[in-house]
Amino acid sequence: MAVAAYPLIQGEEYKKMITAEDGLQGNMLVRSDRTPSSSNMFKYLNTSIQRCPLSARYVKLFAEKDSDIRYKLFFNKRRLNTKCIFTGLRSAEFALISMESAYHLGDKEGALRMLNDFRAHRISSYTAYTMATLPAVDANEYIKTDCTGAALTPLMQAILNERRKELYLEGDRFFELKRNGRPAIWSVYQGLKYTTEKFMYTFPLPPADLQVNPGLIQNPGYTEVIYN
């Protein structure tokens, strides 16, 4: 099991892993290779995302603030990113998968125990959650149901929140939204409102492919969007 072979790390060892721009560090299992051209793109992307503040919703998840090692490691006081983009697999992701799996298999106490262990590796002087002290479900969060369609419980939201905090800039957020209810999200750009509808979490088939093969059926929702 990845978590056993690559146990969770913390403190300076964790900082070294998160700030490393290349190579396998800490409990990384896989990391994308870097070529000269991809290195230039990496630097460009890291520079570009520093111009846009992080979501206030995301920053709000760090309730312990400075006690959480990620609070200063991932972004600064202006909510601008300071974390390196990472594409690969870390043992932390498997730990998060394990606690969510335990939850869905009915082992709520085991899931809580793993959640507390995970948070103890990220938050100094951590006080463990109990079922009674878990934060209430935040009705303002986008994700309102878990992957089974059931309404979020305090424990499941705590697990998903920890996943969101830990895997920031690791290509995880879109897929979390997709597998947990596909919530409609809107934003405003240049005075116009844009909404991500549920069907948009699955991309459309290219029109050229549909013309070549009349047997293909366009994914739901896109017939009106593309052709009307």
Residues covered by each model-derived region:
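Aromatic (Trp/Tyr) and acidic
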Residues: 44, 48
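Acidic/polar-rich alpha-helix caps and helix-coil junctions
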Residues: 1-39, 52, 56-228
